[in-house]
Design a protein with these regions (language model features):
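Multi-pass membrane proteins that catalyze or facilitate reactions on polyprenyl-/lipid-phosphate substrates
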Residues: 1-254
């Protein structure tokens, strides 16, 4: 949960941890429970925006109302919709390659270094606008699609891409986290489909619920922490971390 939303690639850290400690998840549903915890963290922190989108769509479809706030939220909805498409397409086209990447610590190490350099370069971005446009959404969505690879940070690349597009840091971060919701939900549904044949003992369910709780708490804290860092314009700090971890893991996990 702690690394899920920090721009350090939680999937990359998971692969490296499995290599170092020889770990392996016994049940697919563990990932589903963890995803649920992080999903709820985003849902609660950005509940105002999510409620605004739902209300605006309801008014648009059933009441035919066009308030200024409704127009803004409808625009946000379409931006999120467009931003989700690239990840879906790339995920379907390169599913096998992505799955193979999760077996290679070398790929993770290189991608972490790549992510670190990208995050470092965000210090040179300049704010030009306050909101996310449709073209911005598509480009940020492509960045999210690239983050299917372990070692490529989803939050780092989506927020960083937003910064390079001239979007204010807080707005880029807000859009990034909202954009994570359909991805987390989709990943959970796919994992549930894969694990339909698995039987989960009651005591295991209790442990998974505890895992979901920890994922929620640490996910909540990591989002709050990252938002503070972004407001200070210091996203490149995470870049140093990713580069160091990438180089060390590349050397030590040959």
């Amino acid at each position: 949960g702690l690394t899920e939303f920090l721009p350090v690639s939680s999937s990359g850290h998971l692969v490296l941890a499995e290599k170092i400690f020889n770990l392996h998840s016994e049940h697919i549903y563990l990932e589903v429970f963890l995803h649920f915890g992080t999903f709820m963290a985003v849902l609660i922190i950005f509940r105002k925006d999510i409620y605004g989108i739902i209300k605006a769509l309801w008014n648009k479809i059933f009441r035919r109302q066009e308030a200024t706030t409704s127009v803004n939220y409808i625009h946000l909805f379409f931006c999120l919709f467009i931003g989700t498409i690239p990840a879906v397409i790339l995920g379907l086209l390169f599913k096998d390659y992505v799955e193979n990447a999760f077996t290679s610590s070398q790929i993770v190490s290189v991608m972490l270094i790549f992510t670190g350099i990208f995050l470092f370069l965000t210090k040179f971005s300049r704010v030009k606008k306050e909101s996310v446009g449709l073209l911005d959404s598509l480009i940020i969505g492509i960045a999210q699609g690239l983050a299917l690879l372990p070692g490529i940070s989803r939050s780092g690349w989506t927020i960083g891409t937003g910064l390079f597009r001239g979007i204010k840091g807080s707005k880029a971060a807000e859009f990034s986290f909202l954009l994570s919701l359909p991805v987390i939900l989709g990943a959970s549904l796919l994992k549930m489909k894969e694990g339909l044949s698995q039987k989960i003992p009651l005591e295991t369910v209790e442990l998974y619920c505890l895992g979901a709780l920890f994922a929620f708490v640490f996910g909540f804290l990591s989002i709050k922490f990252l938002l503070r860092i972004i407001k200070k314009g210091k996203l490149e700090y995470f870049g140093y971390y990713c580069i160091i971890v990438g180089i060390l893991s590349l050397i030590l996990l040959k």
